[in-house]
Amino acid sequence: MAAELSMGPELPTSPLAMEYVNDFDLLKFDVKKEPLGRAERPGRPCTRLQPAGSVSSTPLSTPCSSVPSSPSFSPTEQKTHLEDLYWMASNYQQMNPEALNLTPEDAVEALIGSHPVPQPLQSFDGFRSAHHHHHHHHPHPHHGYPGAGVTHDELGPHAHPHHHHHHQASPPPSSAASPAQQLPTSHPGPGPHAAAAATAAGSNGSVEDRFSDDQLVSMSVRELNRHLRGFTKDEVIRLKQKRRTLKNRGYAQSCRYKRVQQKHHLENEKTQLIQQVEQLKQEVSRLARERDAYKVKCEKLANSGFREAGSTSDSPSSPEFFL
């Protein structure tokens, strides 16, 4: 039977081989079941192991019979589909034969390849993936079975294929720990922005010496931010505080200057108004003197004319005579 199982991955197509596979009966393989109480009690390690290069048709009578035996070949032989199906059927009967309703005839049909894989096999694949996931979270669940002291090296390279596959997929602890050890050294120096800022500060000197007071006051905020690219945050904050102080000082000086100018303007206007008032007063006094002079003259003329009219009223040459 080992010679038949050592065939290549391609199944034979000759009628003789197909007839042999059809006559192959898996019902004669019985599995010895251990009671539940004995399965829960820790047992001693197995003393009898399956010899390499042979396929076990019946479970061993040792305490390891609760663990389904797997076919193991020499390292040079390639694992075939027959080995997968045999291990899958044996593991399925050991775990729970009534759970998926899988019969040996289904395994034979899947082996022949004339029909697609039945639904119970697909269900078993899901159950096996869940079983692998359970073993992933609990890496030592088989310690409760008898003969749990047997290591992976004693059982051979094909004893637990799913565990072997899982260990190949997972990275080794040394490789997982090496990035963590390299993390502190991944950033040996400051970032590129800090380096650029240090270079700009070292080449151009202090940022306060780069701009004059007039430039800081007259420069807009957007233009200042464009010139401050590459400097450190402390230098930018200090320069903006200086700019704010200069602008406040300039605003205060401007207000003071405006107040002084307004004061001078008001004083000049006051002086001019006082002078105008004095001029108006002088003009009023002059007009008052002229008024008085004209009044005196008018009175004199009135008195002199009355006397002349009284003396010439009877003569015919006077105007009043003809009237």
UniProtKB/Swiss-Prot annotation:
UniProt KW Protein transport keyword: no
Protein name: Transcription factor MafB
Matches recorded under InterPro entries: bZIP (IPR004827), bZIP_Maf (IPR004826), bZIP_sf (IPR046347), Maf_TF_N (IPR013592), TF_DNA-bd_sf (IPR008917), Transcription_factor_Maf_fam (IPR024874)
Gene name in the database record: Mafb
UniProt feature coiled coil, ranges: none
Cross-link Glycyl lysine isopeptide (Lys-Gly) (interchain with G-Cter in SUMO): residue positions: 32, 297
Organism: Rattus norvegicus (Rat)
GO function term, MF aspect, one: identical protein binding
Ranges of compositional bias, category Low complexity: 54-76, 175-203
